[in-house]
Design a protein with these regions (language model features):
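RNase H-like nuclease fold core
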Residues: 1-43, 55
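Short amphipathic alpha-helical face segments that pack within enzyme cores
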Residues: 43, 47-51
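Short, Lys/Arg-enriched, disordered terminal segments
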Residues: 1, 127-129
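Phosphate-ester processing/binding pockets and catalytic centers
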Residues: 24, 29-38, 60-65, 74-76, ...
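RNase H catalytic domain
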Residues: 9-13, 50-120, 127
């Protein structure tokens, strides 16, 4: 079983974004900070999610269960409905990755409970820009 946490941070006035990805497997953590192309927070949250699932796919077997955590309501709702009016292209890429695993459980969590990925995203934002 893999636990995946993602979060994004955006400097709204400048349009810079970064992401934090936290992967937990067998009590080991993989912490990843990434520079994102997105220039607003919603795009950045989808991009961070996509990058998180790409990283998990690199290290997980197809028969693994992935438990995904996000504090982005729009990402969570879109994943559950498998529909996003303005983000369908990004969503389809994420769903394709999710469908490659035997089971993915999506969870919405509060900002406070997503502190690990949040801190990584903030650190990345300040180190990249």
């Amino acid at each position: 079983m893999f636990k995946l946490y993602t979060d994004a941070a955006t400097m709204n006035k400048l349009g810079y974004s970064s992401g934090g990805i936290l992967i937990i497997h067998n009590k080991r953590q993989i912490q990843i900070k990434v520079k994102l192309k997105a220039n607003n927070n919603h795009d950045a949250e989808f991009e961070a999610c996509l990058m998180g699932f790409k990283k998990v796919k690199e290290i997980a077997e197809k028969n693994e269960t992935i438990i995904y955590y996000t504090d982005s309501k729009i990402v969570y709702d879109s994943l559950e409905k498998r529909y996003a009016k303005h983000y369908q292209l990004q969503l389809n890429k994420i769903l394709s990755l999710q469908d490659s695993f035997s089971l993915v459980i999506n969870n919405w969590i509060s900002d406070k409970k997503n502190e690990g990925a949040h801190n990584l995203a903030q650190q990345a934002l300040h180190s990249f820009y």
